[in-house]
Amino acid sequence: MERFPNIEKLSTSKESHVLKAWQGLGYYNRAINLHKTSKEIINNLDGEFPSTYTDLIKLKGIGDYTASAISSICFDEFNPVVDGNVMRFLTRYNGIKEPIDSKKTQNKVKEIGKRLIDKTNSPGDFNQAMMEFGALICTPFPDCDSCILSSKCTAYKKNIVEKLPFKLKKKKVKERFFNYIVLVDPKNKTLIEKRIKKDIWFKLNQFPLVETNFKVNNIRKVSSFNKFINSQKILIKINTFSVS
């Protein structure tokens, strides 16, 4: 916030500077999208942040969840937020047995949320309460006996709380092999490159990388470690060489 105190400052900054300031926070695509959105607002929207769901969702990096949250909490639009916590609560409360990774179920839960939020006077407060309830009460391992809604909860009455919600598809863990080459010259200087592969590290600086689909054993290794990201297992090797 000190580096980019307002949207004008952010929009005129270099993307590399934004990524540098974001360093260590993870989810670097969010920084890239934030920068692109700031330019869109300044250049095409006269510097005015959109105030409706319809306009918000057009911005880079803003999907249904974020557009619903902003439009309801900031601008009192009646758009239900459905995150993982809300999804868990509403599927249990309504006894929805369909897999939550299907679009049909997601739309069904969204429709339930819409019917509920339309009955309120404060859509922002409603959405925040729903998210808090799922995060603190209707957790993955809930204390249903202490829940004020258990007597009306379909899953609780049918003794299927632990079975809901469920996903039909299980992501297969993909293995990736990263072999970084660290070159050091007599002046203790090294070489870095900008990552051009479009993944979560897109446009970030890195040591020269050789990515393979198999484990490489015949390179001099300094250190190695594994990193689990989403459904990926990344095996990383750091290989250092002196150059003259």
Which residue stretches match the model-derived regions?
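Intrinsically disordered, low-complexity, charged terminal extensions of DNA damage-control enzymes
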Residues: 135-244
